[in-house]
Amino acid sequence: MVKYKRILLKLSGESLMGNQGYGIDETRLNEYAEQIAELVKLGVQTGIVIGGGNIFRGLSGTGKGFDRVKGDQMGMLATVINSLALSSALKNQNIQARVFTAIRMEPVGEYYSKEKAIEALQKGEVAIISAGTGNPYFTTDTASALRAVETEAEIMLKGTRVDGVYSADPEKDPDAQKFDKISFAEVYTRNLRIMDLTATTLCQENNLPVLVFNMDQKGNLKKVLTGENIGTIVY
């Protein structure tokens, strides 16, 4: 029995690097595809947004001589590359996936609309939504929150390298305390940087819970969906 029928999974681009310093690690990509395939086979309607930080981060472009708008546009294209890679990996698992883009770029992907994305989900296809919001100055966390709300997901799953939300950086502070659940209000008060403020506000105002968990631990995604107590729920 699955806990959620429709979800939005946010993956970071950096996580696709695996142990490499750049690009896409094929092993990590295939591990993610296997985990996502398990969900689809359980009947979970799955939307996905992937970052592009393994290829290019828009904000970092400003330090390399690009203006912010151009840098963010390059970052959007990086998310499309990652989305195409994940789509191919899913097809190798015999899972149908459709890539949507927030900027028109047919035939690379379909131009995104809420209706088309929901139609794909209802057919049991994975809807991979790329190119952020299509606008500069917005992070892929904000794009994930927006797409989760638009596609009427019950929860946004934020797959990271850590196993939840802590009171401080667990890699730097041995006394950091892990939360099983925490309210958006407390996230604000404690200044915990789970997502940027725009994304957090969007989730809070639309009553969209966020579950932060370690995606790199094989099997965790399925555990989340079958109700095992892992990660941190932000509500």
Model-identified regions with their sequence ranges:
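C-terminal catalytic "cap/lid" subdomain
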Residues: 1-235
